[in-house]
């Protein structure tokens, strides 16, 4: 927001915003200042993802009806280094996949999302929180019986043309 208000176009790495209010602040500021604001997703540029996209565009897989993506990341050694424990605090208060675009970006490319198809229905479920409360106790020295985000989140998205994608996220172990 600051950069757009000071005349700069902005590229943002994920997570660019964590709440709907933060998302609307980015959109409204971009529209008001007439500056571009683009969320980047580094996972669409990896060798495997680009190779798979190239193969799909050449028709090697036929009609694609189902894709899966994931962000399974063991962050155990990094928890003490997050600024003000933002990530642990977010997981304690909210449920869902913080980095959905890591799995969703490549899947959307394969399914031509916003290039002929679009997401229509989303269902997300998670396991109970086992690791999160242990991390709060270890790093914040308090109990967290109210810890919200489960250890593993599964998201299913159906598209307008009835293809679907399955995303998995696991980041607390």
Model-predicted segments: where are they?
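Predominantly a Rossmann-like dinucleotide-binding segment in NAD(P)-dependent oxidoreductases
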Residues: 33-36, 43-147
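Beta-strand-loop-alpha-helix segment that lines the small-molecule cofactor/substrate pocket
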Residues: 1-45, 59, 173
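Coil-to-beta-strand transition motifs
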Residues: 61-62, 161-164
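Conserved small/polar residues in nucleotide/adenosyl-binding loops
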Residues: 165-173
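Active-site beta-strand termini and strand-to-loop segments that position acidic
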Residues: 155-161
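Short, small/polar residue-rich loop motifs at catalytic or cofactor-binding pockets
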Residues: 151
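Aromatic/hydrophobic pocket-lining residues that form π-stacking "cages" and hydrophobic walls in ligand
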Residues: 26, 52, 165
């Amino acid at each position: 927001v600051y950069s757009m208000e000071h005349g700069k176009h902005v590229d943002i790495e994920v997570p660019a915003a964590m709440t709907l209010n933060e998302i609307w602040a980015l959109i409204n500021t971009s529209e008001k200042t007439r500056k571009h604001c683009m969320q980047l997703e580094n996972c669409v540029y990896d060798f495997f993802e680009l190779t798979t996209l190239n193969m799909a565009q050449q028709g090697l897989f036929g009609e694609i009806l189902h894709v899966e993506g994931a962000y399974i990341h063991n962050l155990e050694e990094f928890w003490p280094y997050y600024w003000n424990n933002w990530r642990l605090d977010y997981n304690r208060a909210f449920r869902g996949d913080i980095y959905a675009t890591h799995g969703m970006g490549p899947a959307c490319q394969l399914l031509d999302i916003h290039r002929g198809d679009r997401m229509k229905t989303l269902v997300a479920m998670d396991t109970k929180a086992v690791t999160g409360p242990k991390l709060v106790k270890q790093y914040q020295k308090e109990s967290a019986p109210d810890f919200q985000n489960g250890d593993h989140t599964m998201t299913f998205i159906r598209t307008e043309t009835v293809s679907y994608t399955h995303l998995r996220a696991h980041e607390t172990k």
